[in-house]
Amino acid sequence: MSVFALVDCENFYASCERIFRPDLKYKPIVVLSSNDGCVIARSKEAKQLGIQMGVPWFKTKKNFLKNGGVFFSSNFALYGDISNRVMNILAGMANNIEIYSVDEAFLDLENMNLENSDVADEFAMHCRSLIKQWVGIPVRIGIAPTKTLTKVASYLAKEQTKRPGIFSISNNWMEIASSLKKVPLHEVWGVGRRLSKKLSVLGLRTAYDLACIDISLIRSRYSVVLERTVRELRGETCLQLDKSLDPKKQIVVSLSLIHISEPTRPY
C-alpha cells in the first residue's frame, strides 16, 4: 500500500531568520521582497497581527513596528542553504523524496503500516525532532495513503495540541471522511479559491463534499486533473512521487556548517 508524507517547513523564511536571532522566538517577524517593497513572509505572531501577504511595506510598517515587530530584507542565499540542509535530512529518512518547493517535500514511506497510527506519529515526531535539532527549523508533517491526503493531513496538523505539528490519516474511509469534513474546499490541493467558487454552485463546501461527488460529473464538467483529486481524496493513489531526478541531484549541494549522518528510520 502506498504511504506518503508531506514535510512542510513552518513560516520558512521567518524561521530561517530566527535561527540566528533566538531572542526573536515570540516576536512578530516579516520578511520583505528584494527591494523591501512588500511583505513576502510572516511569522505566526505577524499573522496574528493581521499582516497580509503581499501588502506594501509602507502601508503596514508603522503599525507593525508599534507592536514590537521585527523586519528583515530577504536573503535568498540563506534560505536556499537552510532548505538544502532540511532536504538532505529528509533524503536519508525515506525510500524516495520529491522536493516540491523550497520549504516542502513529499516522502515515499511505502513500508510503513498506516493502520497503526503510533508508527506514523513516531516517525513524524522523530523527523521533526531531527530537523529542529540539526537545522533549527520547525516543520509540520502530514502522513496519508495519497499525496492529496497528505496535504489535508498537513492542514489539520496546524491545529493539533496533543501532538503539535503532526497528523496522519489511514486508508480507512471513516477516518478519511472525518478528516475531510474539517477542511474547507478552497484548502484542497489543486482547488484553491477560484475553482472552489465554481464548485460551490454544486453545493460543495468542504473537502468531504468534493470526495463524495459523482466522478462522471467531475469528468464531464471539469477536468481529468480534478477527477484525480477526487479519487485521491477517497484514498485511491493516482499521483506518485516525481522521480525524474535522483533525490541527491534534486538537492543543490552547499557547504554545511554541520555534519549530517544518515538518520535511522524508526519504522
What are these regions (language model features)?
Residues M1-V102, F106, L233:
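Residues that scaffold, gate, or flank divalent-cation-dependent active/transport sites
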